[in-house]
């Protein structure tokens, strides 16, 4: 059932100014490919700066997996224009390479080398590469080059002052953290709606399976595309990045100290599987350690509570110091119809949904219920557009049609949209609501359905190259709008200076450094 939020919505409508100053940021991943679609084997271009220290342009798992990061912004249009500027700058410096425009990779098989991201000779740079080596050995490299979009979101202090009655961030950090944890619990219960609306990986390249066993009953198009007819986001299925050893972790989102305690336990709990793998072979490290998680970021989660860390501070220590500062939403596939992988409609919907998640009551959630929510997510992932699809309520004790749940949720979201629009003197959020809600009566309007039509017509490889070539030319031709070449060139030079400073400042051997990090 959708919780009753009428009282909270009435409060919001009486206090619209509480939503002025929402802050957001986007992180977009994208694989560098050659003109024929194969994975680029070149190093991260020096002309883009240091992947270790650049503020806006870095790499994720692989040397070829770029990641673009926008600064925190209180204006969606400005944020997306800045993201596009970064793409424009990069497109002009990739030579004949381009970005693969979707989440699921293609033209890659298990025999093709996937170079781990390299970050220089500093201890911290070597540790980042070794962490990725551990991921490769634990889950395979192919799983790690699946790309996505992360959306970082925080409500303004004025909201928490009005809603929770706090004075300032420092004295009110417990109330703010409790509010964000409520958001996260509701996200687990209802976040399947993001996959329904914006899932964009309903099919995969045959090479992605490459003999792997699966229970999924795939169909195959004449183009070779392997797909499930009603799927939304195979990226988030068991085909994608999962960690079976994590399924036994009892990490919950009811209280911040509980969450941090569970996370810290996971990075100190030995794994029999990873102990058998070994820490070193032939004098070379295979992973950072043999625990269930090498570091906290290895925890698979569709949403994370976050705080900006200080130097040499772990994510969980930062949370305990200052409380939750923002949430990181990790459930967005690359939008193949956007040159930058995400669009304004998606950002506005996420604003609405995350505000709703903050306002709606969210009873505490046991580890068992947390696992139960995965059932609904899996149904939407694998057959979200199936007519008459039912979703479980209260761990499956009852069921309701997805369409009924979705439309009920949108009736609340539209009230949030009206409040946000009243602050801005326009109707942007309401228009997004009106457009997206139509997808519940007409599943063919969803992103996965529209993408599937194109995939079946062109094949995933053919369509990927059509879009990649189109976006490459478009971005190369467009002038920068928010940033300028001089700013980006300066950040490139400064990033190399910062990397060199880290390298000369090291006073521990790598073995000593690693021991100090594992002992924290």
From Swiss-Prot:
The protein's matches in Gene3D superfamilies, at most eight in alphabetical order, are given as: 3.30.590.20
**Reactions this protein catalyses:** L-cysteine + L-glutamate + ATP = gamma-L-glutamyl-L-cysteine + ADP + phosphate + H(+)
What protein am I looking at?
Answer: Glutamate--cysteine ligase
Per the UniProt record, which EC number(s) apply here? 6.3.2.2
The record's GO CC annotations read:
cytosol
Q: Which HAMAP family match?
A: Glu_cys_ligase
List GO molecular-function terms, semicolon-separated: ATP binding; glutamate-cysteine ligase activity; metal ion binding
What pathway or pathways are given for this protein in its record?
Sulfur metabolism; glutathione biosynthesis; glutathione from L-cysteine and L-glutamate: step 1/2
InterPro entries, alphabetized: Gln_synth/guanido_kin_cat_dom, Glu_cys_ligase, Glut_cys_ligase
What is the enzyme's class at the highest EC level? ligase
Which family would the database say this protein is a member of?
Answer: Belongs to the glutamate--cysteine ligase type 1 family. Type 1 subfamily.
């Amino acid at each position: 059932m959708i919780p009753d939020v009428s009282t909270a919505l009435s409060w919001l409508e009486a206090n619209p100014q509480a939503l002025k100053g929402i802050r957001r940021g986007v992180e977009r991943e994208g694989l560098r490919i050659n003109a024929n679609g194969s994975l680029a084997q070149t190093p991260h271009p020096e002309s883009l700066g240091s992947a270790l220290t650049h503020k806006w342009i870095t790499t994720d798992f692989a040397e070829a997996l770029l990641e673009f990061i926008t600064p925190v912004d209180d204006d969606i249009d400005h944020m997306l224009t800045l993201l596009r500027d970064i793409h424009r700058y990069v497109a002009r410096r990739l030579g004949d390479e381009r970005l693969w425009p979707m989440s699921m990779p293609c033209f890659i098989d298990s025999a093709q080398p996937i170079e781990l991201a390299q970050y220089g000779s500093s201890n911290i740079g070597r540790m980042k590469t070794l962490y990725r080596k551990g991921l490769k050995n634990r889950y395979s490299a192919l799983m790690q080059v699946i790309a996505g979009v992360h959306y970082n979101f925080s409500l303004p202090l004025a909201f928490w002052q009005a809603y929770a009655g706090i004075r300032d961030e420092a004295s009110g950090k417990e109330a703010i953290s409790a509010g964000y944890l409520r958001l996260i619990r509701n996200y687990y219960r209802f976040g399947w709606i993001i996959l329904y609306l914006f899932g964009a990986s309903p099919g995969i390249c045959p090479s992605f399976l490459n003999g792997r066993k699966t229970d999924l009953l795939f169909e195959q198009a004449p183009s070779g595309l392997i797909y499930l007819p009603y799927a939304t986001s195979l990226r988030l299925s068991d085909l994608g990045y999962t960690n079976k050893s994590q399924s036994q972790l009892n990490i919950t989102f009811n209280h911040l100290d509980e969450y941090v305690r569970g996370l810290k336990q996971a990075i100190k709990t030995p794994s029999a599987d990873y102990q058998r793998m070994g820490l070193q072979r032939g004098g070379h490290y295979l992973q950072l350690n043999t625990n269930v998680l090498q570091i906290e970021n290895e925890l698979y989660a569709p949403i994370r509570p976050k705080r900006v860390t200080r130097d040499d501070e772990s994510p969980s220590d930062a949370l305990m110091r200052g409380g939750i500062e923002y949430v990181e939403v990790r459930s967005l596939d690359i939008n193949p119809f956007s040159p930058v992988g995400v669009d304004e409609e998606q950002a506005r919907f996420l604003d609405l949904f995350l505000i709703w998640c903050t306002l709606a009551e969210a009873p505490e959630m046991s580890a068992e219920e947390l696992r139960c929510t995965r059932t609904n997510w899996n149904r939407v992932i694998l057959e979200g557009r199936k007519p008459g699809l039912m979703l479980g309520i209260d761990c499956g004790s009852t069921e309701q049609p997805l369409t009924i749940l979705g439309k009920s949720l949108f009736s609340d979201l539209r009230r949030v949209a009206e409040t946000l629009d009243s602050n801005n003197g326009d109707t942007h959020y309401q228009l997004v609501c009106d457009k997206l809600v139509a997808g519940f009566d007409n599943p063919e309007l969803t992103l996965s359905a529209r993408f599937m039509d194109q995939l079946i017509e062109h094949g995933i490889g053919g369509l990927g190259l059509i879009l990649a070539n189109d976006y490459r030319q478009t971005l190369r031709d467009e002038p920068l709008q928010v940033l300028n070449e001089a700013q980006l060139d300066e950040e490139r030079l400064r990033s190399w200076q910062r990397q060199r400073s880290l390298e000369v400042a090291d006073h521990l051997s790598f073995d000593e450094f690693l021991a100090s990090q594992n002992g924290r």
